[in-house]
């Protein structure tokens, strides 16, 4: 039995999705059972998770799992990229710890993960109706602007207006939904004119992620949330910033995050 006892206390929704999917992928590859913490354990030690108020149990049906906490030897993620040694030789009875931000840990069970990450019916129907009413089945671009905690964190550089301009030049003449934790900043930018751009006003991470998954093309921020939006959508075109990390983390590789029709700018 392998576990991830810190699931729900080591990052918010999108990080939890990577951790859950990677735990399941590693367990399946090694032929082990796995266990995840109960919902009551989420946010008990991570203030950001508690403040955010959204976790994987809120928006997905993960009832077909083993729940609980088991004391296991900690197995720490050794690198930011895919760890083939861990994937192929992870021992049983360990507790995974880290972020595991690459689809390569679960690409062999992609259909299972997509099934696990189906949005709950009420949320999906609300978002689907919004798209039908406002875009009448037109192809739409998801554009993500992450600011919030990034404003004061050099390890996660803010993306410039110029980055978004260059990305949009690659996808001309299409409607765009702008998703952001700082909609006031987005509304103040001349680039986001209302004739083409709609600023998401959902004010919730779960609705934004669901709406992202209903878009056809994706312009990412350096954020795992928009990464998941593109993955869930099986995006036909993904544009992502080269400067995913900065500061002390500037040399971290993100090559193992790339999938599908992906372009770095």
Regions found by a protein language model. Name each.
Residues 30-42:
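A short beta-strand-loop structural module common to alpha/beta enzyme folds
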Residues 13, 171-241, 246-254:
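Donor-binding and catalytic core of enzymes assembling or modifying cell-surface/extracellular glycoconjugates
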Residues 8-18, 152:
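A short, glycine/small-residue-rich beta-strand->loop->alpha-helix junction that serves as a flexible
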Residues 125, 247-265:
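Leloir-type glycosyltransferase catalytic cores
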Residues 16-28, 164-169:
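Histidine-anchored nucleotide/phosphate-binding helix
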Residues 3, 39-170:
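Secretory-pathway luminal glycosyltransferase catalytic domains
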Residues 10-11, 39-44, 100-104, 146-150, ...:
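Short, solvent-exposed loop/turn segments at secondary-structure junctions
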Residues 33-35, 142, 175-177:
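A structural signal for isolated positions on well-ordered beta-strands in alpha/beta enzyme cores
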